[in-house]
Design a protein with these regions (language model features):
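Positively charged n-region of N-terminal signal peptides that target proteins for export
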Residues: 1-5
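Ser/Thr-rich, Proline-interspersed low-complexity disordered segments
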Residues: 17-76, 83
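A domain-level signal for the mature, folded cores of soluble proteins
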Residues: 73-110, 144, 253-259
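Acidic/His-rich structured neighborhood in mature extracellular/periplasmic domains
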Residues: 102-104, 111-257
Length: 348
């Protein structure tokens, strides 16, 4: 009993002790952290599109510059009668007049601006015939206007090329007159000399015969091809390389049905000289093609060259025939009449 009381007292004391324990102080409240202001959103930079690389342009070969005719009188005289080179009708510079006269080239004519300058001994009728041929090639319908304005501009620039008609072979070649004129005038002279037209004879009082006309046609076509059509349409009529249509045709025909006597072929060497460059071989070949196809007879024929239009037609490639027959190229397609009328017109 006593033990029970003691235990009860102890238990009560323990309970009181526990109940008298001071309550634990509340934990200091940790303040909520001051919110850090949200940074202003920096917008994503606008995406700059990457520029598409522009490839460098492919360099194309520079087109041949078409020169403006120099000193072409207006209205342009299509007068086919020769006159003094100093005449206003001719319209060449004073330097040219003086240089020509110093070499005894005193007579000139300019059909559609093409300068033909003749030595004093060339009869007027020969000069006039050459002028008529040049005019008819440029204006085959003879309406007073050149059919191809681009070719007209090219061949009427006498500071690039002209047609001299010398009389004395010795002074022209051996005496250096040809070279001297070339150096002073800086223009290519595609010659139409007396000795090619009539040989070593004298002119007399007769008009040019068929052979003399054929020589005129050949040299004037050479002139028109080399300084006109070749530069206006180099991909078709070019004679400066072997890349044009007529140059490739020349190569195709070479040593088959065409050989210039100054060029070599297997088992048939050249007779003299050298005409292997395109500006010679192609020019010579195309003259014979053009003249024969138009129904005329060349002054001479290359070795193996067809003698009739029908034979030639069987030899020519379809591509060349098609090009020659296109109206825009204004190639002669019928025999010349050799009688271009005298007139003066304004060429635009």
């Amino acid at each position: 009993m006593k033990l029970t009381v003691i235990l009860a007292v102890l238990i009560g004391t323990f309970v009181l002790g526990c109940s008298s324990t001071a309550p634990a102080p509340n934990a200091t409240a940790i303040p909520e952290p001051t919110p850090i202001p949200t940074a202003t959103a920096v917008p994503e930079p606008t995406t700059v599109p990457i520029a598409t690389a522009v490839p460098a342009p492919t360099l194309l070969p520079a087109a041949t510059v078409v020169p403006t005719p120099t000193h072409v009188p207006n209205p342009l005289s299509v007068n086919i009668h020769p006159t003094s080179c100093s005449s206003p009708e001719i319209g060449i510079s004073k330097k040219w007049v003086e240089t020509l006269e110093s070499a005894n080239f005193t007579k000139c004519v300019r059909p559609f601006g093409v300068l033909i300058g003749a030595a004093d001994g060339i009869p007027d009728v020969y000069i006039a015939q050459a002028a008529k041929i040049a005019a008819e090639i440029l204006d085959p319908d003879m309406d007073g206007e050149p059919n191809d304005s681009t070719v007209f501009q090219l061949v009427s620039d006498y500071t690039t090329a002209w047609i001299p008609m010398p009389t004395d072979r010795n002074s022209w070649i051996s005496g250096g007159v040809e070279d001297e004129l070339g150096q002073k005038l800086r223009s290519y002279g595609l010659q139409l000399p007396q000795w090619w037209m009539i040989g070593d004879t004298e002119f007399g009082d007769l008009n040019p015969d068929q052979y003399a006309k054929a020589v005129m046609v050949e040299e004037i076509i050479h002139f028109m091809t080399q300084f006109g059509y070749s530069r206006a349409y180099p991909e078709i009529f070019g004679v400066e390389s072997w890349n044009s249509l007529i140059a490739k045709e020349t190569k195709r025909a070479s040593c088959d049905w065409w050989q210039h006597p100054e060029n070599d072929c297997p088992n048939n060497p050249r007779l003299y000289g050298d005409c292997s460059d395109p500006d010679c071989d192609v020019t010579e070949f195309y003259h014979q093609v053009l003249v024969t196809k138009a129904g005329m007879e060349p002054g001479w024929l290359g070795i193996g060259f067809p003698t009739t239009p029908e034979e030639l037609d069987l030899k020519l490639s379809p591509a060349l025939k098609a090009a020659m027959e296109q109206p825009k190229y204004n190639q002669i397609n019928k025999p010349l009449v050799f009688s271009y009328p005298n007139r003066a017109v304004t060429v635009r």
